[in-house]
From Swiss-Prot:
One of its GO terms (biological process) is translation. The lineage of its organism: Bacteria, Pseudomonadati, Bacteroidota, Bacteroidia, Bacteroidales. One or more lysine residues are methylated. The keyword Protease does not apply. It holds the Pfam family Ribosomal_L11. It comes from Porphyromonas gingivalis (strain ATCC BAA-308 / W83). This is Large ribosomal subunit protein uL11.
Length: 145
């Protein structure tokens, strides 16, 4: 028989760096989840992605056990890495902070395709381009056909 799902928690944690301090500790402790066990499992599973911010969805059950799914890094963070910037523009419609190529957009879209709600790479590229535009990152050239 399947376990009864009590709820879900969504967090963004740096890979290989989960510890009981906020935001992890209070979020899990309030639900009665073993914080140290989660931290050990998360750090073991994400040691190859150390330092990258990773979204994680924790499903906890009525018996206080849990499962979690680690997703790919957010598009905004991947765009900042690709453009070698620390943050986006405060005024994205007026001031552009960086410029990237459609090839970089395609690479990010291919990486993120499993987490996006689209099925083809062109739609994913348009989503990534929209995020870039809202961050003040310009894209060189025209959309590839």
């Amino acid at each position: 028989m399947a376990k009864e799902v009590a709820g879900q928690i969504k967090l963004q944690i740096k890979g290989g760096a989960a510890n009981p301090s906020p935001p992890v500790g209070p979020a899990l402790g309030a639900k009665g989840i073993n914080i140290m066990e989660f931290c050990k499992q998360f750090n073991a599973r994400t040691q190859d992605k150390a330092g990258k911010v990773l979204p994680v969805v924790i499903t906890y059950y009525a018996d206080k056990s849990f499962d979690f799914i680690v997703k790919t890094p957010p598009v905004a963070i991947q765009l900042l890495e690709a453009s070698k910037q620390k943050s986006g523009s405060a005024e994205p419609n007026r001031k552009k902070v960086a410029e990237i190529t459609w090839e970089q957009v395609r690479t990010i879209a291919e990486d993120k395709l499993v987490d996006l709600n689209c099925f083809d790479i062109k739609a994913a590229m348009k989503m990534v381009a929209g995020t870039a535009r809202s961050m003040g990152i310009a894209i060189k050239g025209d959309f590839p056909e």
